[in-house]
Amino acid sequence: MGFFSFIQEIAMDLGTANTIIISDDKIVVDQPSVVALDRRTDKMIAVGEEAKMMYEKTHDSIRTIRPLRDGVIADFTACEQMMRGLIKMVHTGSRLFSPSLRMVIGVPSGSTEVELRAVRDSAEHADGRDVYLIFEPMAAAIGIGIDVEAPEGNMIVDIGGGSTEIAVISLGGIVSNNSIRTAGDDLTEDIQEYMSRQHNVKVSERMAERIKIHVGSALTELGEDAPEDYIVHGPNRITALPMEVPVCYQEVAHCLDKTIAKIENAVLSALENTPPELYADIVKNGIWLSGGGALLRGLDKRLQDKINIPFHIAEDPLHSVARGAGIALKNVDRFSFLMR
């Protein structure tokens, strides 16, 4: 991008937990989807990692917001501010003019027209000139390297922070899909609730997230892959005295069981609605897992045992949607039928 570049192309995975931006085939932004605003003026104080450091720690003058819930925009103004702040991180170096932005943004396949309009409006208010939307499972499939135009069935399960997107793809279209608002955030809430009920310790959302990363599991038996216990510090729910509680992966697996079962049922439901020929392709090719949820220990094995079809974790599950959106953006003419 030189001095006279007036159009900049960016691909964005606008996620409930994290927002990823790709420009010139490189990940240039990978930040938490959090913004801190001045309560009086609504002026942005911080965005991304800096705002997340403030999350659950602010005083009355500052509010920290996660503008997306369940994969869709919950706070339009905050989302616009956050997008603007994150896009500014892309604009490095000195330019005489701010470039016009050509954007492709990944959106949940179960989004309503109103929800799609909200994403488009936020992007346009954040200086997007040409804004295209692509459904997340389709973007994930492209990012994984699947030939989405082939006359062959492939299934993607994209587990994000706010929603799980399940789609059967063939001939450049989504044949059957199931978008449920059960995902990574629900696993975090399960851990918070479990720690409070079982150990009488209050843990923040961020601490529950750390527990999920360190000892989160979908299976109660991980064998050699078992992580060490994680020590949790927090106040006693009743006495407010400090506590130190070791947590093992087996108990976390038990507390996540119901939420994971919902994801299993959603996958089975999508398979039920899949035509037999495509179903045979999926059994042969296996099912692809992407999104942050794909990193939960043992999830692929649990799903495989339950559904009796091989599951593969994408090579870079956290960035599959963003990479796919980036490829679609570079080949807009070829993939125009996938854009909205």
PLM feature spans:
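Nucleotide/phosphate-binding catalytic cleft detector across ATP-hydrolyzing
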Residues: 1-159, 167-287, 294-340
